[in-house]
């Protein structure tokens, strides 16, 4: 009996997972957000990955559930795990992909090598980081960025003044 893999998200990573899975004899189901997505030809369902009931219905009949992006809400994945759905990687791992500051703190706690970084919450904090690190930094929004969105190379805190309202930034 073949294993059935459910992939939440119909983007490029889902598309890249399909062929190797099929070669291994794995049946693949895809929950795409809309019909025009990269993996839409293999999609067996279309719906909102943020809606628990949509994802719950999709997960029925799959042996393992995964995702092709980090934007699936923690509460959705945790509810599925509580329902007995095998989710891999699990919500505890996903949180580090969802929050760059959390990831940096975890890597630091493990003693892993990484670039110098700081959590900054205002222009003064960013200016201090710039002064200590050669006057330029890569600044990232901790959540929601992808494919260059939420990333700026800056030499002045004013270049990210519009981002400080999100509460905290990652400076590297």
State where each predicted segment sits.
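General beta-strand structural signal in soluble alpha/beta enzymes
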Residues: 67, 87-89, 116-119, 138-141, ...
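Glycine-/Pro-rich loop/turn segments that contact NAD(P) or position catalytic residues
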Residues: 95-136, 151-154
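Structured helix-beta-strand junction loops
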Residues: 24, 61, 83-84, 110, ...
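ATP-binding N-terminal substructure of ATP-dependent carboxylate-amine bond-forming enzymes
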Residues: 1-102, 124
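Acidic/polar active-site rim loop that often engages polyanionic ligands
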Residues: 85, 106-112, 140-147
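CheY-like receiver
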Residues: 57-58, 106, 128-129, 162-163
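Conserved ATP-binding module of the ATP-grasp superfamily
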Residues: 113-115, 136-139, 150-172
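Short acidic/polar capping segments at secondary-structure boundaries
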Residues: 122-125, 143-146, 157-159
